[in-house]
Every structure is written in structure tokens, then in C-alpha cells.
Amino acid sequence: MIRANARGRLTAGDLQLVLLLLSRGSAHRRASLERRLAAEGPDPLLDAPELLERLLTVRTMLVPSETLFFYVMVRHALRSAGIDDRDLADYLAALLLDFGQRDRAWRIDWHDDQRHQYLVDILTDLEATEGDRRFRVMVHLGNYSLWLAGLFPDYIAARHLRKAGPDVSYYDALGRRGFGMASDHALADQYGLGAVLRTAAERFPSVRSALNGVSDRVFFPGTRTTERALRDLGIH
């Protein structure tokens, strides 16, 4: 089960890198940042506008951890979209970390036997499943819809152009449905996910658009398509 815990995975080494990047060699600046870290925790430092650009600049040299990199990328993308929600950023960063491993994106959980390559397979599973597993299938419907539409928008657009698949509105609708149903389930609050899933459902198109920006900048930076040009103009 994916949890909103990316910040909890950050290490002392991650925070030392943040201090290094924000201080830029200034001992006075570093001492000030260390005092702020001790007094307020890491959140204000992770929110620093200049941190994102500096992480991108040193990415190939210092190799920031995936946890630090994804959290900062997602957090800043969400804030740019008008979504100031650290718990949601925690959740989405954890989603990217987990779904990037082997075939995790096709399973509702690491140890689940069924693999779902298509959203219709998840819908079929949802209709046939009861109990606690039904909640996990609901969450996975939201997760998988967001992962596909958030990170691979050009692939979706190309398939739609060839009349081989639906457009992004289909993914938005199913993603909102999955997260919405899951947020109303009794297990949502037990897992500490009620508010996160509710926000993801209510703001799904904006969250997806924020991940489009992460995809454009990090995963497919050299690709130029008509769809990307429209996104750059704010037309989604």
C-alpha cells in the first residue's frame, strides 16, 4: 500500500545535500540554514524556490537520492499548480518511487498475484472484489490513471490521434472515480490517506497537469510534440 511518507524516507545525507546546495559555500548562510533546520524541521528548506533548480543542475554530479529528487520535483510542481499540500506531495513522490520498480505499476500491491496493464482490467477487478482488497483496487484505479496520464501524456495523445485509445479526459474521469471512492472507504482514514485521496480526487486534472510538467522536464526532456507545445502554453 502506497503511503504519504516520502519525507519520512529522507536521510541525514539528503538533508546535508540540501544544506550544501542552499548555502552555496557560504559558512554564514549554512549556519543560518542549520539553525532553521533544527528549529523548524526540513519543510521550509525543501520548499525553497532555488532548491529545485540547484538539484536539477547537480543531478548528474552529486546524484541526489530518488526520494529527495522526486519529493522536491513534485512538491514544487504542485505549488506551481496552486496546490500547497505537503501530504499530497509525499504521496505522489512515493507513488513515483514505487511505480518505477519492476512491474509494481501493474499490481495493486507488491504481493498481489494479479497484473493489470489496462484500466478496464482494474474496473473488472473492482466489480469482482470485496473486503479490504476492494479498497486497494479503488486506490490503484486512481494511482494507475494518474501515473499513465501524468507521466505519459504524449503517448496517450498519440494513441488517441490514431483512434487506438481514449483521450486524457478518460483517465481524468477514472482517476477521480478511483480516488473518490477510496477516500469515502472506512480504510482510508485507518491508513491515514483520507484527506490525501480526497484532494487527489477533487483536484485530479490539476494534479495530473503538475505531473505532466515533471514528466516533460525530467523523464522526457528532449521530446517536442504538439501536445507538449500546448502544455507549455497552458492549454491541457
Predicted regions: what they are:
Residues 1-235:
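Polar/charged low-complexity regulatory segments
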